[in-house]
């Protein structure tokens, strides 16, 4: 199992994943809501949109914009079960465990924190 840092470095080598960045609007939303709220949103999105064994619209359940967590999901290849399978070898067709959900949320939050530390793009 890779560390979060190793995973983020690997994701940066993907031209598609590396193109995602938080917008100024996303950054302001995070500042207004606070990281605790963003983390709760991330946990809720993962639990409801990614964790079920069967996701009816897999590959289309995560919008490309509209919330900082959505951007992080695409940047971290945690946007759909197909990407989770391709990048992290998480089997499709079974519910994500609580531990898997927590690891995904930690990865998303680490990506968001890194984006905030880098400043505006």
Language model features with spans:
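Iron-sulfur (Fe-S) cluster-binding segments and ferredoxin-like electron-carrier domains
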Residues: 82-108
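Short Fe-S-cluster ligation motifs
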Residues: 102-121
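Short, hydrophobic/amphipathic alpha-helical patches that form generic packing surfaces
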Residues: 40-48, 82-86, 110
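Core of compact, soluble alpha-helical bundle domains
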Residues: 1-47
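RNA-interacting cores
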Residues: 3, 86-90, 114
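Immediate flanking context of iron-sulfur cluster ligation sites
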Residues: 56-76
């Amino acid at each position: 199992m890779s560390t979060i840092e190793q995973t983020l470095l690997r994701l940066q080598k993907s031209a598609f994943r590396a193109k995602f960045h938080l917008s100024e609007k996303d950054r302001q939303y995070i500042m207004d809501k606070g990281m605790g709220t963003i983390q709760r949103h991330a946990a809720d999105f993962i639990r409801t949109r990614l964790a079920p064994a069967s996701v009816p619209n897999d590959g289309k359940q995560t919008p490309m914009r509209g919330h900082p967590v959505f951007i992080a999901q695409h940047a971290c290849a945690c946007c759909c079960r197909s990407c989770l399978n391709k990048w992290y070898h998480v089997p499709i067709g079974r519910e994500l465990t609580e531990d898997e959900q927590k690891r995904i949320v930690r990865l998303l939050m680490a990506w968001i924190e890194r984006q905030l530390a880098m400043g505006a793009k």
